[in-house]
Amino acid sequence: MHKGAAKTRPVQESGMDSRHDSIVDHAVEEEANALPGKHCVYSSLRTSLRRYGVNMAESELFMLCGSMCAEYSGDLKRFGPEKYPEQLQEMAASGGPVIRVEPWIAGVSDETDLLRVLTSGYGTMLHTSSTALTYHDVYVKNYPRGHVIELCGLDLGERTAQVNDSFLLDSSGQAMTYVGPARLDDLMQGIIEYAWLVEQPVRLSPGELHAACAYHIRQYVTGHEAVWRGVPSPDESANQTGKAATGKQVKRGDAGYRAFVDDFRLLADMEDQDFRTYCHEIYYNLRLGSALHLTDYTADYCLRHQATLGPQAQHVIELAQSLYADWHKLNLYIYKTGLQLRKQRIPEIRERALNLIERQRHMLEKLMVLTEQAAD
């Protein structure tokens, strides 16, 4: 189900100049005044694909990656979509662009690996620790988190990289973009994985998008793993070994949300500092990647595809917008509860969250019916 011709695009056609120690994509300058994205994974995909003539919205990429199926394995600090490589694998298996992901191995990987993938002529993305992004103080001063940016150029002589960060949250929480240089040696200290398009991407039809969306909603409802076949996954055996070694059961989708919220009960017995920390992490995880993105992207997806989803799409939009507002209110309440050490609020928070999860499932089931009909 992979799209696109399996051939390498010459570097010269992609707007790049290269020599033995550097490569620069001049087209990246067009992104300097672009609107910031809503999430680093999908905004970096969006801008990378657009450079090759494929215009896809973040909401479409979110659906294509199956990212609505948030995962929970028993750690309240960790809740959200699958790991970065697995999301990209889901996208390719759903008929979307094929992207290869390689782990960055300390002491083995170096700048020549980055130069190699840049010279393939297709978009390159870096999954990094935010502390390595020394081009902005907000990354250096705050808690380290995973972040995805585009790599658009290298100058090995100057030891700089040209990057496009399309979802930079400043200290006030305002999203903006950064297009410019990054210190290469700092950057390489934090790379987790690097990824690149392996072939010319092709835009999916609305029917293909709807089929993938319906499939992933069914995953959300049932909690089942993906059953796609024929997608390269060099790390598959290692990932399975890692999962077996942890001995933890990963719950996905609706079941993942319910297990996550059920464990809020553990907050009541925590020491004060731990209580504050966990409430902040819960707030962060609901805000980025799970509930708030799910509802926002659902509304946007339906708005973009009303013509093919039919008049009932408006009802789903209204459900999504209402849910977004209520998740936002509850999430702020969780944040304030942590700051104020109001542990007695936890039963109320759990009850409100479970109600929202029920409404969320109802919304997605409505969308699943519409996408299944539109995919036929």
Regions found by a protein language model. Give the residues of each.
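Noncatalytic regulatory segments and standalone regulatory/sensor domains
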Residues: L156-G289
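Detector for intrinsically disordered, low-structure N-terminal pre-sequences
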Residues: A5, P10, S22-A27, Q249
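Charge-dense, low-complexity intrinsically disordered segments
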Residues: L35, R203-G207, A211, K251, ...
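Conserved active-site-adjacent core of cysteine acyl-enzyme catalytic domains
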Residues: E13, D17-M56, E60-V202
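Charged, long alpha-helical assembly modules
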Residues: I282-D376
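Residues that form generic nucleotide/phosphate-binding pockets
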Residues: R51, V117, H216, D263, ...
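Acidic, Ala/Val/Gly-enriched low-complexity intrinsically disordered segments
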Residues: A5-A6, V11-E13, A238, A244-A245
